[in-house]
From Swiss-Prot:
Family, as annotated: Belongs to the small GTPase superfamily. Arf family.
Organism phylogeny: Eukaryota, Metazoa, Chordata, Craniata, Vertebrata
Entry's EC annotation: 3.6.5.2
MF (Gene Ontology): G protein activity; GDP binding; GTP binding; signaling adaptor activity; thioesterase binding
The name this protein goes by in its record: ADP-ribosylation factor 6
Entries under InterPro entries matching the protein: Arf6 (IPR041838), P-loop_NTPase (IPR027417), Small_GTP-bd (IPR005225), Small_GTPase_ARF (IPR024156), Small_GTPase_ARF/SAR (IPR006689)
Species the sequence originates in: Gallus gallus (Chicken)
Main location: cytoplasm
């Protein structure tokens, strides 16, 4: 009955996996979307999962820790993922190559072949933050031709760009 009602009223559900290097801002983004406020976070060991409703879409967001020791566990969360949010700290130029390697490792996994990709180019408020076109180039996104991707500039602490990212996900997701 729930599926019938959601077809009539347009409520969709989407499973989102939010990944990125440690300290990119994943947990801050999750709770800014969920609670509408900036929260103090500690490094995520394991995961946080929250449902965020926006424009008649229920996003089930899985925020998984990004420390290098736990990245091998990311693949256990891939199954059923419809959208990948990959968060990049745009002020961390020293680790942008590491971010690119991790992103391509994720999207080349067959479990993730149907997921659309939203990149949050986060921490845009910091001096010398890389702009979206630079992130696009440094992450090698132009080589991804077999699926939809988008780079959204964002600032997790103020919320800038976050809802624009969700809007992109809703308009590009085919249920």
């Amino acid at each position: 009955m729930g599926k019938v009602l959601s077809k009539i009223f347009g409520n969709k559900e989407m499973r989102i996996l939010m990944l990125g290097l440690d300290a990119a801002g994943k947990t801050t983004i999750l709770y800014k979307l969920k609670l509408g406020q900036s929260v103090t976070t500690i490094p995520t060991v394991g995961f946080n999962v929250e449902t965020v409703t926006y424009k008649n879409v229920k996003f089930n967001v899985w925020d998984v820790g990004g420390q290098d020791k736990i990245r091998p566990l990311w693949r256990h969360y891939y199954t059923g993922t419809q959208g990948l949010i990959f968060v990049v700290d745009c002020a961390d130029r020293d680790r942008i190559d590491e971010a690119r390697q991790e992103l391509h490792r994720i999207i080349n996994d067959r479990e993730m072949r149907d997921a659309i990709i939203l990149i949050f180019a986060n921490k845009q408020d910091l001096p010398d933050a890389m702009k979206p076109h630079e992130i696009q180039e440094k992450l090698g996104l132009t080589r991804i031709r077999d699926r939809n991707w988008y780079v959204q500039p964002s600032c997790a602490t103020t919320g800038d760009g976050l809802y624009e990212g969700l809007t992109w996900l809703t308009s590009n997701y085919k249920s």
